[in-house]
Amino acid sequence: MAGNANSVDEEVTRILGGIYLGGIRPIIDHRPLGAEFNITHILSVIKFQVIPEYLIRKGYTLKNIPIDDDDVTDVLQYFDETNRFIDQCLFPNEVEYSPRLVDFKKKPQRGAVFAHCQAGLSRSVTFIVAYLMYRYGLSLSMAMHAVKRKKPSVEPNENFMEQLHLFEKMGGDFVDFDNPAYKQWKLKQSIKLDPSGSELVSNSGMFKDSESSQDLDKLTEAEKSKVTAVRCKKCRTKLALSTSFIAHDPPSKESSEGHFIKRAANSHRIIDIQESQANCSHFFIEPLKWMQPELQGKQELEGKFSCPGCSSKVGGYNWKGSRCSCGKWVIPAIHLQTSKVDQFPLQSTALPNMVNFESEKVNR
């Protein structure tokens, strides 16, 4: 087995088995990681101007994830790739790696990998934690504890921790890029980079069909039975499926977000406090193709959505975010108003008068 389990090294920390963590110093100093720890693979989570030549010369197997330690980088997009890289180091030549099909918890590791970033405190830690969740089925808190007990100073930034929480909600094994929470997070991150939303909506590929067969094809029959359709209350044009909804959890009544506070004009004086409503007044939703003319054409920070069938107001958007009647802030906010639409089970036979806007356009 790689390394000496009892050795203490400030630059290279053994986390579990053949998994080692550290900063850039061992790379700069050309430490013989192979001779010292039997390390054969190096995961560099850092932006190199040039990959250090000695790493190649010494025959290490390299994986470079060129990212910064910031509040906007999407690290989730790399988890499947880096987990596979670490797998192939620790458990070489396996026929199957999926943790859904095979259990390696009692399987001896046969390799050693060194994951590093600049300081070994945030970026590289994030990928090791993701691997421990993926391979050993650990919760996020357990995986963080497994790293912190060996290196207490580690502290992934808030952005990376938020994504690790998302990964945990996805099941902690593979990244689900169609997960509504992930899509909402991507929207929120894009607004951080461009508060106007113009860069986001300039990509026509981000607009989704109002009735996406791709979403439905991924569902089991039991899940399909729970899908609902939303239609304009006035003309019955189908506007969306519930598979496009972006879920939000109403805040607790005890929290400040769970109350609406009214202040006097030009003053901080509170003149009224009301509790948030139990029922939500909005369906927050992904950008849909029928919204494209409004979002791409006008490029405003906020606006209204009109039904493509009858032009009645059915919703709105605000790139800075808006507040649901339940009190929850959603950023960015793209929504349909529950008072302007009807919601029915998709598989219900009680929808004889529903108009499918997309098919109507084709037939005209």
From Swiss-Prot:
SMART domains per UniProt: DSPc
Stated induction or repression of this protein's expression: By nitrogen starvation.
Cellular component annotations (GO), alphabetically ordered: cytoplasm; cytoplasmic stress granule; nucleus
Keyword Hydrolase: yes
Domain of life, source organism: Eukaryota
Claim: Lyase is one of the keywords in the record: no
Active-site residues, as the UniProt record annotates them: C117 (phosphocysteine intermediate)
GO molecular function: preribosome binding; protein tyrosine phosphatase activity; protein tyrosine/serine/threonine phosphatase activity
Tyrosine-protein phosphatase domain residues: 11-173
Gene3D superfamilies: Protein tyrosine phosphatase superfamily
GO BP, one annotated term: ribosomal large subunit export from nucleus
InterPro entries registered for this protein in UniProt: Dual-sp_phosphatase_cat-dom, DUSP12, Prot-tyrosine_phosphatase-like, Tyr_Pase_dom, TYR_PHOSPHATASE_DUAL_dom
Catalyses which reaction(s): O-phospho-L-tyrosyl-[protein] + H2O = L-tyrosyl-[protein] + phosphate
Enzyme class name: hydrolase
Function of the protein: May be directly involved in signal transduction and/or cell cycle regulation. It is necessary for maintaining growth rate or spore germination. Could show both activity toward tyrosine-protein phosphate as well as with serine-protein phosphate.
Other noteworthy facts: Present with 7570 molecules/cell in log phase SD medium.
Family affiliation: Belongs to the protein-tyrosine phosphatase family. Non-receptor class dual specificity subfamily.
Protein name per the record: Tyrosine-protein phosphatase YVH1
Source organism of this protein record: Saccharomyces cerevisiae (strain ATCC 204508 / S288c) (Baker's yeast)
Gene name per UniProt: YVH1
